[in-house]
Amino acid sequence: MANYFNTLNLRQKLDQLGRCRFMDREEFADEANFLKGKKIVIVGCGAQGLNQGLNMRDSGLDISYALRPEAIAEKRASFQRATENGFKVGTYEELIPTADLVVNLTPDKQHSKVVADVMPLMKKDSAFGYSHGFNIVEVGEEIRKDITVVMVAPKCPGTEVREEYKRGFGVPTLIAVHPENDPKGEGLAIAKAWAAATGGHKAGVLESSFVAEVKSDLMGEQTILCGMLQAGSIVCYDKLVADGKDPAYAGKLIQYGWETITEALKQGGITLMMDRLSNSAKLRAFELAEQIKESLGFLYYKHMDDIISGHFSATMMADWANGDKDLFAWREATGKTAFENAPKYDGKISEQEYFDNGVLMIAMVKAGVELAFDAMVASGIYEESAYYESLHELPLIANTIARKRLYEMNVVISDTAEYGNYLFSNVATPILAKEIIPNLQKGDLGEPTPAVEIDNITLRDVNDAIRNHPVELIGQELRGYMTDMKRIAVAG
């Protein structure tokens, strides 16, 4: 199999990268009706598999789970999750032949095996679904021509997909139809109904492409969403301890700091996050963000280039073939970092203290979001997609660090995201330690920024620069569709 994106000519590549249309709510008037009365079989019962299935069942759809015989016989976690929630469970041979829609929600590295196993069992003119297009775009999987291939990609972890649905809301979602597999022209109707069944239509749906979803998703998770948070956590903790701060306090400031500051990001973008600072701290955070951009800009664009060319996916798949040797080594090394082993702090840190004592962290968030967004847009990805894969998902990933530090983040995200995270953070961490940390000033991290005389013109220009960055302009528009977003912070 060959990388699908690399088989396209330039015009086709640009067309696929630029597929991005925010769908009107009226387009979902039929909600999930197109799939009602049809048999839907989900392969895989992890976080996305279980929680999407629960939502779809509650929306009136017929859901069952196809698992491997050994998973059933040994009553593995996937079997227990499905049966404990009252779902019908069977083998591929028992359930796939009668399915109208088979939804593959297994990890990326299992997709080719799943396709090889289920495709011969699928009935003529049925449909096959993904929630991430890596297998189609990067692996180049070819699906039988009578089968319709669609994607519904919630822009949140599976647990959040369920929680928002239970609130009567949903999470922003990308949908797509594979242009090589839409024989009856029903792909969009299937994808819309599936998205509605998960609740996504209530938060906003982008009609995208497999290509745009994959390239933007990989870029976001490798850089700002995971890689920057990991690199930032490590260098900020080490700096605080080196400055004589209580290691327990330093650990808590970092662990819960990302979540607290990105909660403001979620509600009002970079503008609101920066507005939580004093004027003196805001000017300093802006200055630090520009320095971080200068140091790390090349790395963001290198990751984007490697994703577009297919170099990243080829490198990762080589590690798959090598038994995930690099992935496991990097995972072990992360577990040994000082931040991961910081003692527990029982004291209280107020919400505002996370902002006042975390100016460098805020600068890292600002620089990282803007760099990731700019790199995606410069590569032909539309602003809406770039926003969802950078700023929008950041509070959700920060929330995982608040639970159990970097370990939890790397457990919750996919192996694909984890591998990309390490590629980025392994390079970014020493750069930040060498070029940014030694030049910090009093008040950049661990204590409030001293008040300085404020020049009105400078403050005006900085505020204008913050508010007029393209990620802020598109973010203000898209957040208008998500006015019911709840707070997710667990900090205390």
Curated annotation (Swiss-Prot):
Pathway: Amino-acid biosynthesis; L-isoleucine biosynthesis; L-isoleucine from 2-oxobutanoate: step 2/4; Amino-acid biosynthesis; L-valine biosynthesis; L-valine from pyruvate: step 2/4
Positions that bind Mg(2+) 1: D217, E221
Residues of the active site: H132
One GO molecular-function entry: ketol-acid reductoisomerase activity
Highest rank taxon of the organism: Bacteria
InterPro entries referenced in this protein's UniProt entry, alphabetically: 6-PGluconate_DH-like_C_sf, 6PGD_dom2, KARI, KARI_C, KARI_N, NAD(P)-bd_dom_sf
GO cellular component: cytosol
UniProt xrefs under Gene3D superfamilies: N-(1-d-carboxylethyl)-l-norvaline Dehydrogenase, domain 2, NAD(P)-binding Rossmann-like Domain
Binding site for Mg(2+) 2: D217, E389, E393
Protein name as catalogued: Ketol-acid reductoisomerase (NADP(+))
Source organism (scientific name): Haemophilus influenzae (strain 86-028NP)
Gene giving rise to this polypeptide: ilvC
